[in-house]
Design a protein with these regions (language model features):
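Bacterial N-terminal signal peptides
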Residues: 27-35
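Regulatory alphaC helix of protein kinase catalytic domains
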Residues: 46-60
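A short glycine-centered flexible hinge/capping loop motif at secondary-structure junctions
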Residues: 232-236, 429-433, 470
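Periplasmic alpha-helical coiled-coil/stalk elements that build and connect Gram-negative outer-membrane
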Residues: 55, 85, 184, 188-302, ...
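Bacterial N-terminal signal peptides that target proteins for export
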Residues: 5-27
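A small-residue-enriched
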Residues: 62-163, 272, 276, 300-367, ...
Length: 497
């Protein structure tokens, strides 16, 4: 987008072929004046803001990975799910617990001796002893008995599930599948961050190129203005032509300032992505491979094997399968081994086996089973759609890469023609057969071609990054940067004098 704006601005700079061609002597003086003006422009000190941080592409990737809160949050979620799955690994083993109790008590009762007579009279019958006991008991008073104290006890108990019908294995599998889903989300977050970094990194590079070309166009317009002023003094052009040159210079300066502002904004956006406290200057240039990338089938295979979206869908299906297995397990008998022992000098203990089987429940378990089967079906259909969408995205990006490569290669002929025209214009100006304004026109058009070429290189880089992102291998772009057929477009590139 930035280069498109610059290209439009470049094309708006008028070049005036109708001006009168100067004599050879005047042409030489004009060339000297242009050189002095260009030198003065180059030596003019500019405002020095915060010193930018220079980062290559790999360094920017590493910083972005370290500084991204979103990626850190995804990693924390994945770690949490992993800890949950690890915690459930021992599910189904024995559980042992210890219990203890301390109690303070107070007991009180009233005893009536006369109440004991009926039980003893039955044994003695009508003997004189029985009559004597009855007479004695009637004279005894009742009395109160009270007792208080503290008692304590401890016990140890154990429970061991012997058979759960697969419910425990289903719970463990569900936790493992949730961990896989969280890992897929983390990988997807990392891939998205890599794609964002790639877009902002090379956007900043493109903006720097555009700013350089726009600044060069402003210097060319300055030469134009200086030449027009000299020609007006010599009386070879009209005042209106001089006014047009001044207007073109002001327009070029304004456009150069806007392009520089765009470049600074792109550098700030890149700095935010990598977590830097100052603007970032990218050092890895835009590039285009002169040879085609691997065949389309190669990227299809990579996407099917490594795309995190497919890994997440697979984890969702596994979750549905494990939930279905757990529900089915709960429909069968549950067998537990139990044991308990009192911890005393002469402990009491008990051990046994408990069996539980729910024959009827208020919950319709058949409907729940069908629901989990529908979840599995949904995951299968989602996987099929995701594979189709990913293949379409891969093919679209692969074709975009190849189209950008072809356009870039075709531009070499245009640049060669422009360079040849510049050579002829310079030679004509030295020999007095051409005008300085014709040379400026050729330089302006060549700068526009270089801008368009840089824009195509940016489109190629972004298409390649999109292809690798769709294939689940976003960091492989560094491998393509190292290929021997890579052609680099740097901000310092300028037309040959």
């Amino acid at each position: 987008m930035l280069v498109t704006r610059v290209a439009q601005r470049l094309s708006s700079t008028a070049v005036f072929e109708a001006m009168i061609r100067p004599t050879p002597a005047l042409a030489a003086s004009l060339l000297l004046g242009c050189a002095l003006a260009a030198t003065a422009a180059d030596l003019t000190p500019g405002a020095t803001a915060t010193t930018p941080l220079t980062l290559d592409y790999l360094g920017a990737l590493d910083r972005a990975q370290q500084q991204s809160p979103k990626l850190a949050a995804a990693r924390a979620a994945a770690d949490g799910r992993a800890l949950q799955a690890e915690a459930l690994r021992g599910l189904g083993g024995p559980s042992v617990s210890v219990g203890a109790a301390v109690a303070r008590y107070r007991l009180g009762t009233s005893i009536d001796p006369g109440a004991l007579l009926p039980s003893s009279s039955g044994l003695l019958g009508n003997s004189p002893l029985a009559a004597g006991l009855a007479s004695a008991a009637s004279r005894l008073p009742s009395f109160e008995v009270e007792q208080s104290g503290t008692r304590s006890g401890a016990s140890v108990s154990a429970v061991w599930p012997l058979y759960t019908g697969g419910a425990i294995q289903g719970a463990q599998g569900l936790a493992a599948a949730r961990r896989q889903e969280a890992e897929a989300d983390w990988l997807a977050a990392g891939d998205d961050l890599d794609a964002l970094l790639t877009e902002r990194y090379f956007s900043a590079q493109l903006a720097a190129i555009a700013a350089g070309l726009r600044a060069q166009a402003a210097r060319t317009a300055g030469e134009h203005d200086h030449a027009a002023a000299r020609m007006l003094q010599e009386g070879v052009i009209a005042p209106v032509d001089r006014l047009q040159a001044s207007t073109a210079l002001r327009d070029a300066q304004r456009q150069a300032s806007a392009a520089q502002s765009d470049a600074e904004l792109a550098a700030v956006a890149l700095a935010r992505t990598v977590g830097a406290g100052q603007p970032v200057r990218p050092s890895t240039p835009l590039f285009v491979l002169t040879q085609p990338v691997e065949p389309l089938a190669h990227f299809f295979d990579l996407a099917m094997a490594h795309h995190p979206g497919l890994a997440k869908v697979a984890a969702k299906r596994t979750q549905a399968e494990q939930l279905h297995a757990a529900q089915q397990g709960l429909r069968g008998p549950q067998v537990l081994a139990l044991a308990s022992s009192q911890l005393r000098d002469r402990p009491n203990w008990a051990a046994g086996v408990a069996v539980s089987w729910t024959l009827w429940s208020s919950i319709d378990r058949d409907q729940l089973s069908r629901a989990t089967l529908k979840d599995i079906e949904q995951a299968d259909l989602t996987d099929a759609q995701a594979r189709s969408d990913i293949q379409l995205l891969v093919e679209r990006q692969w074709r975009a890469v190849d189209n950008a490569r072809r356009q870039f290669m075709a531009f070499d002929a245009h640049l060669a023609e422009g360079d040849e025209l510049l050579r002829l214009r310079r030679a004509g100006l030295r020999e007095g057969t051409s005008t300085a304004l014709a040379l400026i026109d050729a330089e302006t058009r060549q700068a526009q071609r270089r801008t368009e070429r840089a824009q195509i290189a940016y489109q190629y880089t972004q298409a390649l990054a999109g292809l690798l992102h769709a294939s689940g291998q976003p960091r492989d772009i560094t491998r393509y940067l190292a290929r021997p057929d890579a052609v680099f477009i740097k901000p310092t590139d300028a037309p040959a004098p």
